[in-house]
Each structure stands twice: as C-alpha cells, then as structure tokens.
C-alpha cells in the first residue's frame, strides 16, 4: 500500500514537468535579429497527431489589427494575420522531444518553411527552426503559460 501511494505521489509530482516538454501552449515569438517580441502563438494538437499554431496576439509596434497576409499563396491569402494558422502538421519524432515534418508560415513574406520544434530548458522555451533545404534560421520562443 505504501509503495502504491509513493508511486502515485511520484507520478503526480513529475506530471507537470512531463506536460511542459511539449510545444503545446501559448508562446511569445521573439525576433532573433532584433530581440523584439513580435507575437503570441497558441500551439495545440489537432487530434490527428499533428500540431496547429495560430497567431493570437500581435505585439509589434507597427502591427495593425486589420493586416492581412497579402503575400500568402495558399488558402491563407488575404486572410487576417490575427488568427492566422502559421504552424501546420508538425508531428512528434519517435523517441525524441522534437516535432518535425510540418510547415511554418512567415506572414510577412508569405513563405512556408520546413519546421522543427524543440522544447528546451524544461519546456520554458521552444527552439523553432524554419528551413528551405540546407538554409534556415532558428528562433527561441518563450512560454507565456
């Protein structure tokens, strides 16, 4: 009985740490060049094993509430940037705390990049890598909640 209670307590204590080693949640996007907070993106599981990230809040000084994705070339063309799906389809890699295989959209230029998401620092930060072939860049996002 004591062993069972101890096991339950250990699982309960460790569960919050496990839950945070996922890209799901609300993240603040920080520009890797300027250090400026640009937006808040909510990432959630679609239920089909893939992730979806929606731009919930714009933080840039020059952001306008009625901005649309003029440069997008897919179903997001001319859609409001606020509420735009910028992450689609990333799935957890087998045996790793990495989500890949999806795409991330840069609403400023309309380009889609191959995506890799890696929670770091116990899930407090998220490495977001967007690439085309061997070329890409990495941003570190901060967990908001």
Where are these regions (language model features)?
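Sec/Tat signal peptide C-region and signal peptidase I cleavage site
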Residues: 13-19
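Edge beta-strand at a domain terminus
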Residues: 123, 132-145
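Structural motif
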Residues: 47, 120-122
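Central antiparallel beta-sheet cores of small beta-barrel/beta-sandwich binding domains
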Residues: 24, 29-115
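Positively charged n-region of N-terminal signal peptides that target proteins for export
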Residues: 1-4
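A generic beta-sheet turn/junction motif
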Residues: 34, 108, 121, 132-134
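Cleavable N-terminal signal peptides
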Residues: 6-7, 17
């Amino acid at each position: 009985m004591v062993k069972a209670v101890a096991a339950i307590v250990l699982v309960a204590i460790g569960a919050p740490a496990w839950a945070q080693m996922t890209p799901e949640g609300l993240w603040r996007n920080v520009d890797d060049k300027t250090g400026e907070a640009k937006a808040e993106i909510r990432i959630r599981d679609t239920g089909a094993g893939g992730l979806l990230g929606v731009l919930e809040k714009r933080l840039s000084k020059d952001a306008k509430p009625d901005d649309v994705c003029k440069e997008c070339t897919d179903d997001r063309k001319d859609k409001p940037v606020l509420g735009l799906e910028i992450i689609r389809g990333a799935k957890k890699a087998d045996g790793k705390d990495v989500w890949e295989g999806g795409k991330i959209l840069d609403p400023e230029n309309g380009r889609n990049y191959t995506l890799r998401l890696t929670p770091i620092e116990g899930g407090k930060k998220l490495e977001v890598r967007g690439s085309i072939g061997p070329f890409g860049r990495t941003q570190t996002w901060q967990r908001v909640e």
